[in-house]
């Protein structure tokens, strides 16, 4: 009987141990299932993250390709802008050279005009001398005739110089018109270049690559354009000054022309008087 009780107790203990072990295994199984589910969720989450990363990578590559293409286009635009700036510098240099030549011609015309004015003054002096001379003897008449010939020569020389001055003034006016046209063309080109550079600058602001360098180059171009605009304004001011000088010279030429006409009329009267005097002397 004791053996049976001991055996029953041993079996009960074995049963309890088996139950405990079963509970432990069941708990471990549940935990394993939970870990498996958690692992599967993590795998699915990682797959989603991997897909998102791949999508973001594709998008980033597309953006990089687009940015690279835009950067290449902007580099081409900058190269073209640099070419335009160089061409504009050359045009301004040519304009300044044309203005310098115009100023030289204007100075020459001024000198010629001064010579013509001096000749007219000399003619007036000779006329007064002729009027004050006595026509009483043949010797004085000969001297008067020689002086009259000299006065006529001076008048003809003044006419020739006046024609030369008029021709030079016409050339100066033509040069000034061409200079003004070039100045207007240069100003229009600057406006176009400023618009192109403004568009390039706005596009470069959207790029994250080389943004600082692009901004610096944009400021440099703006400074260059500002300098070119100032040069054009100075050239236009010089052209306006030259035009005003030409207008003043034209007025002076008109005045001298009127004086020459009057002098010619006076010379004609003196010649008529001399002819009459010669006739009277011949009659004696």
Curated annotation (Swiss-Prot):
Biological function: Tropomyosin, in association with the troponin complex, plays a central role in the calcium dependent regulation of muscle contraction.
Pfam families tied to this protein: Tropomyosin
Tissues expressing this chain: Expressed in leg muscle and chest protection muscle (at protein level).
Residue(s) carrying N-acetylmethionine: 1
InterPro entries cross-referenced by the UniProt entry: Tropomyosin
Domain observations: The molecule is in a coiled coil structure that is formed by 2 polypeptide chains. The sequence exhibits a prominent seven-residues periodicity.
Molecular function, one GO term: protein homodimerization activity
Coiled-coil segments: 1-284
Stated name of the protein: Tropomyosin
Assigned keywords, A-Z: Acetylation, Allergen, Coiled coil, Repeat
Encoding gene, per UniProt annotation: TM1
Stated family: Belongs to the tropomyosin family.
Disordered: annotated segments: 1-49, 103-126
Quaternary organization: Homodimer.
Organism, scientific name: Chionoecetes opilio (Atlantic snow crab)
